[in-house]
Amino acid sequence: MINVEIVRNYNKWREHRKINKGLIKKITQNVLVRFDHFDKIKQFELSILLTNTAEILTLNQQFRSIEKATNVLSFPNNELNWHNLYSKLEFLYYSDYMHLGDIAFCYEVIYNESCEQQKTFENHFIHMLIHSILHLIGFDHQNDTDANIMESLEIEILSYFGIPSPY
């Protein structure tokens, strides 16, 4: 079971009714099911903040020391790394619960990117959600090899939902 808490701090998000707990749960489940050790955990929790440029800028400055608005920020609750994901998940064998972390999405940046890239807002949001969940479970794109692995997973999951590759 995946428990999703959503905080909407910006009214524009309400225009996109498809972006809801059900969608977020479905996407999260589709990411996690690809990794065997997650099936041992009975309950996951994920916190979502749907916000605007001003708040994402503040968060980016506060937590990453970057003075720029961004599309999404991921705050993992665990020190996971996909290179040793299975050994790191061994501590979860005896746990029924895992808080994956927090994700903050910026409406204006995602909206502008979706227009520039000629995608629907919802499809771009889904891509950013998949990308963020992968970050929460230890994936990153700090080098070309890791970026290629992460992008391949994103493409695979997006295709499951009928969304073309963004790359």
UniProtKB/Swiss-Prot annotation:
Its EC number is 3.1.-.-. This is Endoribonuclease YbeY. Its cofactor is Zn(2+). Zn(2+) binds at H131, H135, H141. It comes from Rickettsia typhi (strain ATCC VR-144 / Wilmington). Gene3D superfamilies: Metalloproteases ('zincins'), catalytic domain. Keywords: Cytoplasm, Endonuclease, Hydrolase, Metal-binding, Nuclease, Ribosome biogenesis, rRNA processing, Zinc. Binds 1 zinc ion.
